[in-house]
Amino acid sequence: MQTKNILDFEYSDLQSYLLNELGLEKFRTDQICDWIYKKRVFDFESMTNLSKDDRQKLSDNFKISIPHIVKKEVSKIDGTTKYLLELEDKNTVEAVIIYYPSRTIACISTQVGCPLKCSFCSTGQSGYVRNLSTGEIIGQLLAMEKDKEMDVKNVVYMGMGEPLLNFNNVVQTIEILNHPKMKKLGARHITISTAGIPQKIEEVGDLNKEFRLSVSLHAPTNLQRDQIMPINHKYPVEQVIQSCRIYQKKTKKRVTFEYILIKGFNDSKEDALKLVELFGDLKVMVNLIPVNENPAGFEKPSKRFIQAFLDTLVKNGIDAVVRAEKGSDISAACGQLRTRELKEANR
């Protein structure tokens, strides 16, 4: 009998299966979820408040498939921890634990590789293999939590891949993260990042959930964005912004935009003013990210240019910050996942 990964199941579907297919009482669902998501116990035999018969039924029908930690690197600068995780089919993904003074964040992947091939991002250079299953996405968080012996209260879908191209599985993982009997994370502590898939951004608005949306913009014009983000040929800047307006009208929530600053390319005061004009009356927050080491050889602007860009946005009524760099010494910063793996493979 082929067993199913229990991490693929939302609460209601799991309860229904346990009740109708295995004959387990309803309250057993809560006990099983507590063992997996709260206590991080990943074998049924250790679930001691279940009867031996129930444990056998679970083992016969389910597996708890957690990615194997192949490699772990810890930043000597800030403690950021990057994991190389192996899936059952031997494909690998990377995920990261990031520490801030007020919170700890798990950055998780949604695809093996990425099809978008943004020129400043290492993940896209490794090619695209497939979407991750619901259980494979959730499993990254559980593997890191067990290794760190801690509960992570903030999750960002900013690892490898484009989350909105794996829409159904990503939404299902959010239900699992948010459910009070499963991970019980507050929806506002969950952020989906996207390179800008207009139809899917609007669908996120239709969900009417409290999780946050972050859009990777990185340039104020199509001429610039075309050069660094091939997806812009299909979904130009204006279309992305319009979908964000529709999202905001539906949800009443502010949209966060990620903007990588590249020396001599998109870092001038004129670029900042074009950004202000592009946003118009859209309520936004802009995270400015000085570009990290990347396959295209792009360089960071000087601190003076970064500050001038920030000041121009703020003076024109745009909420903006320069995002603190984390994990750059272990290639765990924005756009760097899979960098070292690629370098080692090419030696």
Swiss-Prot record:
Cross-referenced SMART domains: Elp3 (SM00729)
Catalytic activity reported: adenosine(2503) in 23S rRNA + 2 reduced [2Fe-2S]-[ferredoxin] + 2 S-adenosyl-L-methionine = 2-methyladenosine(2503) in 23S rRNA + 5'-deoxyadenosine + L-methionine + 2 oxidized [2Fe-2S]-[ferredoxin] + S-adenosyl-L-homocysteine; adenosine(37) in tRNA + 2 reduced [2Fe-2S]-[ferredoxin] + 2 S-adenosyl-L-methionine = 2-methyladenosine(37) in tRNA + 5'-deoxyadenosine + L-methionine + 2 oxidized [2Fe-2S]-[ferredoxin] + S-adenosyl-L-homocysteine
UniProt binding sites for [4Fe-4S] cluster: 114, 118, 121
UniProt remark on cofactor binding: Binds 1 [4Fe-4S] cluster. The cluster is coordinated with 3 cysteines and an exchangeable S-adenosyl-L-methionine.
Name the record gives this protein: Probable dual-specificity RNA methyltransferase RlmN
Active site, renumbered: 94, 334
Organism of provenance: Petrotoga mobilis (strain DSM 10674 / SJ95)
One Gene Ontology term from the biological process aspect of the record: rRNA base methylation
